[in-house]
Amino acid sequence: MAASWRLGCDPRLLRCLLGFGSRRSPELVKGAARWSVGRGASWRWFHSTQWLRADPIKILMPSLSPTMEEGNIVKWLKKEGEAVSAGDALCEIETDKAVVTLDASDDGILAKIVVAEGSKNIRLGSLIGLLVEEGEDWKHVEIPKDTGPPPPAAKPSVPPPSAEPQIATPVKKEHPPGKVQFRLSPAARNILEKHALDANQGTATGPRGIFTKEDALKLVQLKQTGKITEPRPTAALPTTPAAPLPPQAAATASYPRPMIPPVSTPGQPNVEGTFTEIPASNIRRVIAKRLTESKSTIPHAYATTDCDLGAVLTARQNLVRDDIKVSVNDFIIKAAAVTLKQMPNVNASWDGEGAKQLPSIDISVAVATDRGLITPVIKDAAAKGLQEIADSVKALSKKARDGKLLPEEYQGGSFSISNLGMFGIDEFTAVINPPQACILAVGRFRPVLKLTQDEEGNAQLQQRQLITVTMSSDSRVVDDELATRFLESFKANLENPLRLA
């Protein structure tokens, strides 16, 4: 950046500051830099252009969601040399949730695009571009050598052990000549050990030479009929004295295993039994990681009930006559929000030490997109009316499918709802979306004949429209008794739409 100073002082003082002697010329030209000292004026000035250039502003890969670790550059919206104002869209970044626009935080000129569009798996904190101030020579901006993310904090060094541990060499089991080493199934191994039989006395009939349970049972029958004798005990093999092994050899040393032909051969898609690897997007990888963590770390419990939608369908028809379009799913969201307001203990999460009740009722609604499942959030759903919920769901679902959700539109949430009724699914169980404690799985509504009584007590068959809902809950936060009471209240609220007003 060109920098200039105006100094209102005597030229002799400037000469001293610049290191000039009294006999030096008041003007000095060296390379592309120029100093000059004016004479006969009320002010003096000093100007430098090359030696005081500011460093460019770094544009780093930002963290656009709590679970984001990497990002993809989908498209650059500005070109090199183009002026940028604070708030202008610089580029589109695909996160683990959606495609988000990165806005500029400073005014200037986009000098360098360090990471081209289409680049994938860019770590957080990596340099993706450089910005300079207006008037700078943006064409000659140098790219820093270190463009990667900052290194993690150094861990305290652990002193090496005083002596190398001695690892005994594993003794290889020698097989007598003429014997074949079979691969035993667990059941077959148990039977052979129980009856003191040797697999070499029989024949392996399993796939790829596996000695199966049936093969072991045949040996037992032959032994019982006297057609085979028990194997003679062999002399114990001499053992080798313990000797130290290098770490790599110690890690790979094991008993020999029979050679098994591979099930598939990568790289040959036309060969039977092979596969084609499908590249996973950031969203797919994060979904897989979070689902695995959820099922392996959260104790899931399930509770199921049926709800009669007769009153909801009637109320929906009445609203349509007034040109108010709401779906059955909007009624379900509203019923869940009202129930959470009545039972705030369910509107909670587990923070590692205990349950934490959440202040706002924010409903996450699962939306299927080409990039995977994403859950936009209906903020403060208990305070919204049916029409507001319907409008929010439509707008957020469209943005989710277009990949235009903002981070604040899918982050957070205190309770999730996943509805597969439109796909003809009667009922299912869903995986909890951490750190939330519950998710409600909703199936399709279906006609069912039920035996009821009229006002006079006479039995009669009536057709009812039922849906099955299953709540998955974190047992650390919502126990079975609390989950049961929640579903009872949810059912009562949904079957009586007037309670939702």
UniProtKB/Swiss-Prot annotation:
Gene Ontology cellular component terms for the protein in this record: mitochondrial matrix; mitochondrion; pyruvate dehydrogenase complex
Protein modification: Delipoylated at Lys-97 by SIRT4, delipoylation decreases the PHD complex activity.
Sites bearing N6-succinyllysine, chain numbering: 394
SUPFAM superfamilies listed in its UniProt record: CoA-dependent acyltransferases, Peripheral subunit-binding domain of 2-oxo acid dehydrogenase complex, Single hybrid motif
CDD domains per record: lipoyl_domain (cd06849)
Modified residues (N6-lipoyllysine): 97
Molecular function GO labels: acyltransferase activity
Domain Lipoyl-binding: 56-132
A single GO BP: pyruvate decarboxylation to acetyl-CoA
Protein's name in the database: Pyruvate dehydrogenase protein X component
Gene that this polypeptide is encoded by: PDHX
